[in-house]
């Protein structure tokens, strides 16, 4: 008996020593663990790309490298769950074959993604384009991820009768198998994954014809259905709602608080990069940034009460140190070859054609969100609009007074070295025109001088709350003071010509403005941020309100002039300063030119001088509230005195 005990003691001691030496993790018997990899907002960035990160030029992203990382993780745990938070399309040349090849969705399937959802940019190709893309994915015969979205309001649409676009999408959803949620078995763990489309995402989808239920209420109902009908261990959500600095307006934080049964939210749409997960109650919110620059990785362990604890979390940089999977890269290259023949050939380009050599350090994309000032990246794009319109062989002779590029339409910057057609397209890669061809067209519109000043005020007062509304202009210069009262921050606003001459703006005069179609369509959202106080109404040259902005597309012999093509033409037009036969980006763009001047004065006179009608209104409202408060205080005091007198 003693011998057996000694043997047992020796065996246990050896086992404990082995565990310590080999660092084998010890978990309670029956404890369930889930490993998750995730992305969101990859925006057609199948290939790696060069951009500016923290002031340095780097090669980042790429599905071939992400495939390498996923395969490595799955070697350790074949049951790793792979999720995506939507906006997998619209951002590079590959989107030009979106509706015929479904390249993005097929590549997500090839990489081993389990579930994705729709972002606002999946609707950029309109109902027909989205429907065709889903059908192309099915017809490819390849493995594709499940798609979940729980808040499409088919009942409301069917009550009013489905229009043609809604019918097309409904048929495509049914054919693909789009669901409110999907249940996935990973090892010994059953996981329900809910998909949801956010409120702000809908605001950013002007061509979407679908109606949606309130995201929180829809997820709440779906989770209740899951708990009633499915025996699952975990409930995750792929959300295209986003997180924001203001917690009260942060959609996925609101979702976490109001639907506490969610264990994990993959948060897309806001392009947020969370180095630490956000936690509300027992719900974790994670985000890894845009364009596949990072692959999110986390592990969760089930606790005794059935809820889950995040035991590890990291954002893995998809850098040039990672070896790309060769078979994946081959598939990407084959898909990219179709772009040259099926799209760029119609414009007379190839994707690797060098348009200009660049020695200028342009602002990064991140700086457009963090710096509220003139940026050279916006300057060159807005100047390109003017050049392309006024140098078109179909130019009608009507000079462009102002060209406008909002930061929300800019998708990447230009690095030093050769700028190719692909680089230019990727910098402005959104949408589709009325002609059904990829790329938003430039449009003609007219605004009064008074409205031009309001546009400057939109930038000065609204864009800190909605950074996508930051405006970069050619022809319009203004100065603003960030310390002045909201809606009265602009202190100087005027027009300039090519020679720099200052021209005063006449309030009642109509001015010729060129911008892209998406910007025109998004005016409503920007105006909503000012609660209707700032109203811009695009007009035709006769001053009549424009009913359909698509009809204002600038045409060249029945073809739309695309915004990206305007930039490409401008790049190609630059002087060849080194004699090698290739244009060079001018030194002019190495500096700024007082197009947007920030006056940081806190002098009381500078803060209150020249009040406009908005500041007067705000002051009057504040005074009214002050008078009301004083009256209430006076009345309360009188009542208190009366009560005291009666009690004496």
Each model region followed by its residue ranges:
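N-terminal secretory signal peptides that target proteins for export/translocation
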Residues: 1-3
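Generic structural marker for isolated residues within well-ordered, non-membrane alpha-helices
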Residues: 5, 13, 252, 382
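Catalytic centers of hydrolytic enzymes
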Residues: 30-38, 44-69, 75, 110, ...
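Hydrophobic alpha-helical segments with strong N-terminal bias
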Residues: 7, 99, 432-433
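Acidic, metal/ion-coordinating pockets
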Residues: 27-321, 384, 446, 463, ...
